[in-house]
Amino acid sequence: MKRLKKIVLCISFLFLTIFIGGCGMGKEAEIKKSFEKTLSMYPIKNLEDLYDKEGYRDDQFDKKDKGTWIINSEMATQNKGEALKIKGMVLYMNRNTKTTKGYYYVNAIKNDKDGRPQENEKRYPVKMIDNKVIPTKEIKDENIKTEIKNFKFFVQYGNFKDLKNYKDGDISYNPEAPIYSAKYQLTNDDYNVKQLRERYDIPTNKAPKLLLKGSGNLKGSSVGYKNIEFTFVEEKGKNIYFSDSLDYKKSGEV
């Protein structure tokens, strides 16, 4: 009798394990599918092509509003004992007017004596004409001018055709918020990792983890966000990461 109970318990545990594992794999597939709607658009070499591309629309959108694309890419590095240095750019591409404006930003975040983070962000307003980003105000710093001139968004060279091949992700899902994420360990042979290393001075040989994180309805929503992040180093006082986002919003919100 005791042996029979043990067998029943083992079988029950086995079914429970399979069920939980199946749920995890199902949620991973849902998260991938949610991101795939946007990531399948990468790469978009000519950003002005986005004027003719429509994102997810729901009943929150005005029928006359064609929406606005928001693009953001940034690289962040922090050595021990130093500030977290961030450089990036954000563009707002209005499909109604077919005009684009935004800014290039440089930030240095360091904790004060009480441990509170203090930002020191500088913004340089820009606009885009004929797929070229140009400053709208005079910039005296030649390095900043060069950085703006040479800047490329990840959406212009990133490629996620192999997204379906990423396996065994660390999955997190909170239906209450709702927020969700999937994290994958990459190798330095990954196409996107190679592209980042070609464009940025990344002071580590460690292969990054890819984090897909978002909020809102997994099946689609005009609210919330979807971000991707390549985390090379994440330690106390030392961080190296690259983040990117491509969002489609109501024009009145931006």
Curated annotation (Swiss-Prot):
Residues 1-22 form the signal peptide. It holds the Pfam family DUF576. Keywords: Cell membrane, Lipoprotein, Membrane, Palmitate, Signal. Disulfide bonds: none annotated. It is a lipid-anchor. Its main location: membrane. A lipid is attached at C23 (N-palmitoyl cysteine). It is found in: Cell membrane. One of its GO terms (cellular component) is plasma membrane. InterPro entries: Csa (IPR007595), Csa_sf (IPR038641). A lipid is attached at C23 (S-diacylglycerol cysteine). Belongs to the staphylococcal tandem lipoprotein family. This is Uncharacterized lipoprotein SAS0074.
